Amino acid sequence: MFSVHPEPFTLIARAGSGISSFEDLRGKRVNVGNPGSGQRATMEVVMDAFGMEMGDFALATEFKGSEMAKEICDGNIDAMIYTIGHPAAAIKEASTTCDVELVSVTGEPIDKLVADNPFYRVATIPGGMYAGTDSDTTTFGVGATFVTSATVPADTVYVVAKAVMENIDDFRNLHPAFANLDPAQMVADGLSAPIHEGAMRAYKELGLMN
């Protein structure tokens, strides 16, 4: 139906770890995400883009999202990755418990990923959102999407889609990650499936689509 907030691929490193780019993870202890998770899948995509393998890390751990903050603050890992909307509780926990910093993930490999895959986009995490990171962090990510089944009646989808777009200010207030949503982008960017006919009718009426 529409895309929502971006979920940036986020690299969090212990302060003083010597990690200032994705490639600096070589020789470090890195949480790569638990098997079968979206975190792990995205990490493997990025590793492949940079020509890296698990063996390039001094240690590759598989902690869940709920475990990562404790592990990095206990000194068991040097860095963790998390693809999530911001602000994120796990990153807040880490940044308020110990000295960590967000690291930008950029370069030609990322530019190519974004260019080759319509579901990826450049993403920015505002500076000051987390303790220890005062400047903006540039990375890439996916857009969370609001989906429905193709079998749902068009009139039902029409009502929902129109209500969201006509009340976008109220929708933005539902979660901090929604604060900067732009209806024009929501109906055009980061969509990996066709727009339902009911939603399309609503968007055309509202002038969001031709």
Segments the model singles out, each with a brief description of its role:
Residues 1-5, 85-88:
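Acidic, polar ligand-binding/catalytic clefts
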Residues 3, 7-74, 169-172, 185, ...:
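Bilobed "Venus flytrap"/periplasmic-binding protein-like clamshell domains
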Residues 8, 20, 32, 109-112, ...:
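A broad, structure-centric signal for solvent-exposed, well-ordered loop/edge residues
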Residues 18-19, 30-32, 49-52, 82, ...:
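Short, low-complexity, polar/charged sequence segments that are solvent-exposed and flexible
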Residues 35-45, 120-188:
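Ligand-binding clefts/hinges and TM-proximal coupling segments of bilobed small-molecule sensing domains
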Residues 54-152:
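Pocket-lining segment of extracytoplasmic ligand-binding domains
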Residues 67, 74, 84-102, 112-115, ...:
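An extracytoplasmic/periplasmic, membrane-proximal ligand-sensing/linker region
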